[in-house]
Amino acid sequence: MGGRATGPPSRNEGARFESIPKPDGGLRWLTRLDPAGDAEYREAVRPLVGRIERALGPEVLAIRTRPAPGGWHLASWGPARAAWHETLRNITREARRETTFAVADVYDCYGSISPEMIDSLMGPEAAHAVDFLRRGHERGVRGLPIGPDPSAVLANAVLVELDRAIQRTGARHLRWVDDIFLWGSGGEVPRALRALDDVAARMGFALHPEKTRILADRDEARAVALGTRDSSIIAAP
């Protein structure tokens, strides 16, 4: 998952910031909210959770939500990641010889998702979440704060637009946060990549040029999909 090299956010009451190295270089700044801030963010996103979850198809393996007493929680990372790997293995093993494969990745995904984008997509129901994000922005947090579970939910509200763009082309895909694996005919897959580029530009972000490409064949598809280190922002805890 690509991102711009940035320094730490400014001091933020109710939060601390922690840097971790990214597999492709640079640092990723995680936001660690205090209990009050975490509770506020979760409550702000709570009215949106069911609506966002219902919009997601089975092609989305990560950051699925489940109801819980008094709120919600994210489905366990381990089983979801195992399902991702198993599904990719099955796809690459069973695909016809003429199948075309591709991968795509959103550049600086969380940092590119602005409060205004959430407001535009989710409407008045998102007012509290948008206000929370704007207050974070005033303290130097770009886009969605990386780390808190509610950010993952809001990311899916935006990234589902990429799912829809792919589906309109006839290509098929799986998505793990903003990491996308596509397959289909030699016409469908290039068309899907163009559609992704168009919808990303329209929404205000971009595909990562080094991580978005058509793959040479089934062997490369298997190697790329299953053989690389997990760079997801919701990698295993």
Regions found by a protein language model. Give the residues of each.
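Short, conserved non-catalytic motifs in the polymerase core
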Residues: F17-E43, E59-S76, G136-N156
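Internal hydrophobic scaffold segments of catalytic domains
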Residues: R32-I52, Y110-I113, A206
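PAPS-dependent sulfotransferase catalytic core
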Residues: A225
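Conserved polymerase palm-domain catalytic core
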Residues: A75-V177, F181-V199, M203-E210, I214-L215, ...
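Short, flexible active-site-proximal loops enriched in glycine and acidic residues
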Residues: N12-A15, A55-L56, H128-F132
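Catalytic "initiation/cleavage/transfer" segments centered on a nucleophilic residue
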Residues: T228-R229
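Active-site-proximal segment of RNA-dependent polymerases
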Residues: Y41, V45-V103
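Non-catalytic, polymerase-adjacent accessory regions of viral genome-replication enzymes
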Residues: M1-G26
